[in-house]
C-alpha cells in the first residue's frame, strides 16, 4: 500500500510555513473597512463603478503588506495571515451585533481586540443605511416579507457577500497581462461617441477599469520594493530569492508572464485581489493544469526549473491560498461551517478537441495537494471514460490521505448538459468546478450563486400537509391546500406538494432577483468584471450582463428526507393502512415523544423503503416531487436575461454545503421518522444509516435523479474507513465502483471522507491531538476542530460504506 510518503514531504521551509498557518488564531481585521469607508466618504458623488474602483485603489495603495520569511510567493489579504477583513459596503449589521460574541461561538471562532471593536463601531454609523444589506432589504417587496421574517429564505449568503462561484480568465491574464486589457480598454474608450447617452455609462466603466488596473500594478510594485529592501539585510540565498521576487513583482500581473514562477505569482496576485475587492466566496482557479502547463513545459524543456522546484511553488501557492479568510454572521455559519472559501482547482478532464487533458503538471498538482494536506484549495478531478488510468489511480491515493479531496466530476454528464443549455461545445469541454460541485466555463461565466434561499423540501412538505401553514413559524405561507388528515389519497398530497412548492419557488425568485438588482446597483466589482469575457467588449459589469454565459442554480436541502417521507406516507398510510393519517400527524406534532408516537416512528424508520437502496418505489417518488420544482424554476429568468449573456436562466442544484444542519434545526419532525431540529440529509446523499444495500445501491438511487436538469451539481458524499482501503483489492473495487457510477449510471459527482468514526469521536473529545484533521463537510473540506458540535455530529453520523 502507498501512503503519504509516496508523495514526498514538504521542504523544511514550507513545512514551517504550513505549521505557522495551522497555529495562527484568526482575528477580525478592521483595516480594509477603514480604508473602504475613507474612499466612499471622499467619493460620495461619483458613479458607483468609479466609487468602487477608487475604493479598491485606496485599499491596495495603503493596506499593510509583508513578506513571510518562508515564502516564495507574495501577497496578503489582511494585516496578518488568516485574519478576516471586514467589507462594510455589504453589511455592518452582523459585525456590530456580534462584536462581543465572535470569540464565544461554538464553531467558526474569530478573535478580536478592543481597538478593532472601537474602530468598527466608529465607522458603523456611515454605513447605517448605506450598504448592500440596508438597500437590499428596502427593495424587498412586501409579498415576501413573511418568508424573510421567519427565516424561511435566508439572505445571509446574498446580502452579506459579493461576486462568487466563478473563475476569471487566467489564461488570457498570463498571455496578455493586465497591460493587454489596459490597451484594449483605452482603445474602446477612445472610440466612444459621448453624444450617444448610452455611452456615458460605458465611459465611466472604462475609467473604472483603468483605475483598477493601475491600482493592481501599484500593489505588485509595493511588494517589489519591499522585497528589494528586505534583500539588503538577508543572507545570500534569501537575498537572491528576494531579488527575484522583486523582479517578478515589478513585472506581473501587469506584463505577460514568461515563465512558471512569474505565472504562478501573477495568478496569485489576481486570485488574492479578487478577494480584497469583494468578499464573495468560491473564487476559483479554474483549469490550473491547462493554463499553467505551457509555462511548466517550456521551463522544464529549457532546464530552467525542476519538478521539485515546481512542487515547492505549488505547495507555497496552496499555503498562501489557505491564508485567505472570511468571517460570516453566526446565522450564515450554520450553512457554511468551517470558514470555507471554496477556492476550487480543477485538473484532468478533456481538451477542447476531446482528448485526455492530463499532463505532467496534473500529477504535480496532485502531489502538492497531498503534501500540504490543507482544506484549501478545493481540488476537483474531471473524470471521463478515457482518463489516464495512472492519473486516476494517483487521485485515489490522494483521496486515501483523508482530506476529502479530490472530488470527482463527470464529463460524460456535465458537458452534454451545458451544450443542451446553449454553451458552445468548445466552452463546454473547457468547464471547471467553481466552488463545491457547481461548474462553469472559466473566464466566460457571470454566475452568482444566489440560490442561497435553500428550498427546504421536508419543511415544504409539512406546509403542504398543514393547509399552507408553516409548522415552524405557524405563519401562512401559501393559500389553503388541504389538511393531510382529511386528504382522500396520496395523489391529493402530491397535488398539494405541487401547489406549495411552485408558489414557494416563485417567492424565492422574487427574493433572489431583488437582491441581484441591489447588488448590481450598489457593489459592482471592477477587477472581476475586467477578467471575465466579454464585460470589456460590452462595457458592462458581470452583474449588468457582461459575461458570455450567465446561469443561476437554486439549491435544495433534504432530498433524501423528502424521498423517505413520501415513501413512508404512501406505503404505511395509504397502501397498507398500517398507520392512520391522524396517528401520523399526531406523532409529528408530538415529535415522537410518547410511547404511541415512538411506535409510529419505529414503523416509519423500519418498515418503509429508503432512498439510497436502489428501490424504485421510493426513488421515483422523489423524482416526481423534484420535477415540480424543476419545472417551475425553469420558468423564471434571472436579472441578466436578454441583456447580453447566453442563458440568463435558472436550474437546480444540490450543493447544500452544511445548510442541512441549520435547515434541519428550523424543521419540525418529518414523516421519515426524523425528529424536530435534527439535521436533514445533505446534498443528494441518503439519510444517515438508511442506506443498507451498499455503495452500488446508493449510486443507483442517486443516478435516478433528473441529473441532466440539476446542472448546478448533484453532490454525493460517501464515507469509507482508512482500514478498508489498506488492501489493494479494495482500492481497485472502489475505482471500478466510481467508473461504473460515471460511465454506466451517468452520475454527476462523488467525493469521499476516508476517516474512521473512532478518529472523529476522539478528535471531538481531544481537539488538541487532531489540529490538522480535515474532513469533507459537503462540497468542501474544513478542519474538523473549527466546526460546531452539531456539524461534527452530522459528519460522525454518516454511513460507513463497505466495498
Feature-to-residue mapping (PLM):
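A conserved hydrophobic secondary-structure block that centers on an alpha-helix together
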Residues: 230-237
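Extended non-globular scaffold/tether segments
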Residues: 203, 207-219
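Extended, non-transmembrane alpha-helical coiled-coils
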Residues: 218, 222-225, 229, 244
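Conserved catalytic cores of very large enzyme subunits
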Residues: 2-206, 237, 241-244, 248, ...
